[in-house]
């Protein structure tokens, strides 16, 4: 039987545990690099879901470990931007390892004399071969184009890279590193519960989601990456207009689009007064406002995972409901995701190698 998008979502707990167990080996090259020279400024080259994964992970680098991270879209970087000579480390993120724009961005950085690490699911891919150091995401290649397991694995690897850099440069004690790893292991273990909770939530609200013609997700901080990946997954699978916004950015114009057809998701780790105030305000203007939270709640319009996490780790769990809802909503709308569309797109547009 061919795997589906849901097959890979259900494999996430095992995949993440494997990454956690083997990360000292799979990330050995970046640990050795950081032991030889100081690393304080990083450049991440990523597009699509890889860009969203970088948004999810950046908070851990910056707020917890004091490592400055710039995230650049490769095409724009190649044609319209310059290489910052103060950059200490460059990581090109591409699950397939075939992104033509990411490859071009790597070559631009290397021409400026900066070494490039490639974080990819295929070390033998074009990007893996061109990189100076290759880091295996350690999940293999998904046979479904709408990546889920690979997305979560990319987020986890980026979080572990942040921890590895901090540990290699003695910015944290081993006890703190072990505590974070334990939290991540606990997080992986509750993913089956999060999947079940989301399935029940979908069953309660199937009519609303099945008939939805415009979807919007809103997050903040690291959860902006979750909202943006919601946008990517719903656009790819549900195939109606779908957007993900940072909380404050939504308040500066996009709210004016709201109408009675909109279905909105508000994403939080812990109760957030500003996010909830926006949800309350928008409730009368749109079809439905849902809250997705790591805290407890009895409200039937709230998907409460009841598993508190620090903000900089929360995206790794909160992305799971977005993935499940994309799959279930697409299926409810009768979309057969096993049927490829725009099959010649990459060949004609040369977006992938």
Summary of predicted features, one role per range:
Residues 26, 35-186, 220, 255, ...:
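Glycine-rich phosphate-binding loops that contact phosphosugars or nucleotide phosphates
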Residues 167, 240, 270, 288, ...:
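Short, well-ordered loop/turn and helix-capping segments at boundaries between secondary-structure elements
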Residues 304, 308-353:
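Peripheral docking tails and interdomain loops at the edges
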Residues 2-39, 133-135, 141-262, 334-353:
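Active-site phosphate/pyrophosphate-binding segments
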Residues 6, 17, 55-58, 62, ...:
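Predominant activation on well-ordered alpha-helical scaffold segments within soluble catalytic domains
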